[in-house]
Amino acid sequence: ADYYSQRASAGLIISEATIISKQGIGWLNSPGIYNNEQVEGWKKVVNAVHKEGGKIFLQLWHCGRASHSDFHDGKLPVAPSAIKLNGVYIQTPKGKKDYETPSALTIEQIEKIIDDYKRAAACAMKAGFDGVEIHAANGYLIDQFLQTKTNERKDNYGGSIPNRYRFLDEILQGVMEEVSVDRIAVRLSPNGIFNDMGSTDFREQFTFVVEQLNNFSLAYLHVMDGLAFGFHEQGEAMTLADFRKVFKGTLMGNCGYTLETAEEAINKQYADL
């Protein structure tokens, strides 16, 4: 609570990534938002931030394939398709391990995860958060559905660009049952190579996603357009200016900005935050 309250003067805080279920974990000591004990713990953080005059959104997170069976009592991590993450190692509760080939999700499992997002959003509201940010970036589960690099499904959740967007859309629809849409944000990382990502049709995919998000009056769209996390080099990087041409709402830029470059982006009206 002290860590967050010390930063409340920034205006808006986006929490650390917070898992929506036990299945969602892939980092040691990650916080969660799926039971009453966690809700009570987060209340202390939220109250401390509010006491200092700040606002705070909770970032909803599922790691998908970027995990290991050591986190899940021996069960494989899950993903849209059984495609292994090409990485050096993952730090698990039992030490450094090689990544594993994940288990491809069934339709029933997908529906359960969508419900988990909805339940986690309800828990966030119970804890007093001002809103939630759906983490659809950085090679985690939602991003894995969006990109052909990690999604080879042949059903309604794979193949075409609209099908690959479907998972995010259904999560958004579920979260909206618990949280007012103007208190919901989405985070995307079109250019990132982190967690072994990058698809050849990324520009078409993410342009489509943003066009669809225009149908919702989101609190903001959070774009990791900067290249500080590494660029996948599958085409010309998508910039804030590209997103501004498409997205009609409040746009937030992130990743590798300095004070000067951030102010320049805002002054040129490429971003609002």
Where are the regions a protein language model picked out?
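Flavin-dependent oxidoreductase catalytic cores
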Residues: A1-L273
